[in-house]
Amino acid sequence: MAIHPVEFRYGTPEMRVIWEAENKLQKMLDVEAALAQAEGELGIIPAEAASEIVRKASTEFVTLERVNEIERDTKHDIASLVKALAEQCEGDAGEYVHFGATSNDIVDTSNSLLLRDSISVLRDKLTRVLEVLLALADENRDRVCIGRTHGQHALPTTYGMKFAIWADEIHRQLERLDACSERLCVGMMTGAVGTTAALGEEGLEVHERVSEILGLRPVLISNQVVQRDNHAEFIMVLANIATTLDKIALEIRNLQRTEIMEVGEKFDPEKQVGSSTMPHKMNPITAERICGIARVIRSYVVAALENNPLWHERDLTNSSSERIILPEACILTDYILKLTLDVLCNLVFYPENIKRNLEFTGGLIMAERLMAELTRRGMGRQTAYAAVRQCAIEASRTGRSLRDVVLERSEIMDYLTVEDLEEIMNPETYIGSARRMVERVLEESQKWL
């Protein structure tokens, strides 16, 4: 019976299958097979035994049920796997299973295989999010909207700017994921304290050959574990990615507020229900889910950092933690990437509300432009600031437009014509270098994809 939400509610099939118990078992068997192959090639174990171990290192022969049955007695998962594999091997080949290895050689190296596959899935979705954001930036480079600081109307900006800023950040997250992957996905076959003592003089050759067979980079040095700064970095990168998605979703949620309603999630009025009691509700539930799950992913960072300081050459305190945080962090990050794609690919714009919000303050958002233009025409900057500020305060107090108040101020109108003022008060023409900035991101993105 499914209990955890990642089993039935949060997750994608392509990521769940990586972390399913049978696939994890197969990856551990793959490591045992690579060990036997390397030892057979180097003459450490008989070539016939190595071939038999490689042939039987499959869940076709070593079943999850049998491993679990043995573990009920041994209370040790890898010892149970070794016994289950050995009993499937013909002749005396089973006697050579796991020779020279320690349990964590199998665990850490198989985890690297799982994480490599997970990163591939994550990278594909991150790249797709980047592509969608770049397309939105291109399509909306001229869609002027109000920019907000401190929750208040500030200056005009464009939706193209919003999307381009997010695209640039997603690109940095891709770079971080690639960089940490190089350090994280390593092979290890170095024995109980990292010295390869049980393998004799060929120890380092076995270590390197196992990694080569599995397509991994051999770890340079280790004790009984690959050092957990790599795993902590990976979880922090996932938390960072989740936080970027959180930021995007949070902005969309805020822009979907009733009093703003500039953009919003797609809502199916024929089928979708917003509230069990309020028939009118159309809630941003997907964006809210992204934000909620991002909080969970960030919480894994503490556990990942706590897993780095272990006793001496190794203790087991990291193991139980990583059985939870590694699959869950991968599954949940992948899931909210999928949700982000759903939101962005179906984003609805409300142009009339965007225009309404640009005009909401009665021109107060153009105060900076007015001040700057007065300064360019000869009024001192401080004097211009004070004069425009007085007009803005008067407009706010009386509910009149800034334009109407300014028209009555001769000390300002001495520098302007009415036509000048009309142009100054047009928010559509006060977006600075926004268009060029978006174009720069679009041009630079040709190197990213």
From Swiss-Prot:
Catalyzes what?
N(6)-(1,2-dicarboxyethyl)-AMP = fumarate + AMP; (2S)-2-[5-amino-1-(5-phospho-beta-D-ribosyl)imidazole-4-carboxamido]succinate = 5-amino-1-(5-phospho-beta-D-ribosyl)imidazole-4-carboxamide + fumarate
Record flagged with keyword Coiled coil: no
Where along the chain is the active site annotated?
Answer: H150, S275
Q: Tell me what organism the protein belongs to.
A: Methanothermobacter thermautotrophicus (strain ATCC 29096 / DSM 1053 / JCM 10044 / NBRC 100330 / Delta H) (Methanobacterium thermoautotrophicum)
What pathway is this protein said to act in by its record?
Purine metabolism; AMP biosynthesis via de novo pathway; AMP from IMP: step 2/2; Purine metabolism; IMP biosynthesis via de novo pathway; 5-amino-1-(5-phospho-D-ribosyl)imidazole-4-carboxamide from 5-amino-1-(5-phospho-D-ribosyl)imidazole-4-carboxylate: step 2/2
* Similarity-based family: Belongs to the lyase 1 family. Adenylosuccinate lyase subfamily.
Alphabetical GO CC annotations of the entry are: cytosol
> Quaternary structure per UniProt?
Homotetramer. Residues from neighboring subunits contribute catalytic and substrate-binding residues to each active site.
**Enzyme nomenclature, EC number:** 4.3.2.2
| The gene coding this protein | purB
Query: Which SUPFAM superfamilies does this entry report, sorted A to Z?
Result: L-aspartase-like (SSF48557)
Q: What class of enzyme is it?
A: lyase
Binding site residues for N(6)-(1,2-dicarboxyethyl)-AMP: 9-10, 75-77, 102-103, 224, 276, 281-283, 320-324
Protein's job: Catalyzes two reactions in de novo purine nucleotide biosynthesis. Catalyzes the breakdown of 5-aminoimidazole- (N-succinylocarboxamide) ribotide (SAICAR or 2-[5-amino-1-(5-phospho-beta-D-ribosyl)imidazole-4-carboxamido]succinate) to 5-aminoimidazole-4-carboxamide ribotide (AICAR or 5-amino-1-(5-phospho-beta-D-ribosyl)imidazole-4-carboxamide) and fumarate, and of adenylosuccinate (ADS or N(6)-(1,2-dicarboxyethyl)-AMP) to adenosine monophosphate (AMP) and fumarate.
Which GO biological process categories is it annotated with? Answer: 'de novo' AMP biosynthetic process; 'de novo' IMP biosynthetic process
Q: Which Gene3D superfamilies match?
A: Fumarase/aspartase (C-terminal domain), Fumarase/aspartase (Central domain), Fumarase/aspartase (N-terminal domain)
Molecular function GO terms recorded = (S)-2-(5-amino-1-(5-phospho-D-ribosyl)imidazole-4-carboxamido) succinate lyase (fumarate-forming) activity; N6-(1,2-dicarboxyethyl)AMP AMP-lyase (fumarate-forming) activity
Q: What is the protein's name according to its record?
A: Adenylosuccinate lyase
Keywords from the UniProt entry: Lyase, Purine biosynthesis
Q: Taxonomically, which superkingdom?
A: Archaea
Q: Which Pfam families would you find in this protein's record?
A: ADSL_C, Lyase_1
Alphabetized PROSITE patterns for the sequence: FUMARATE_LYASES
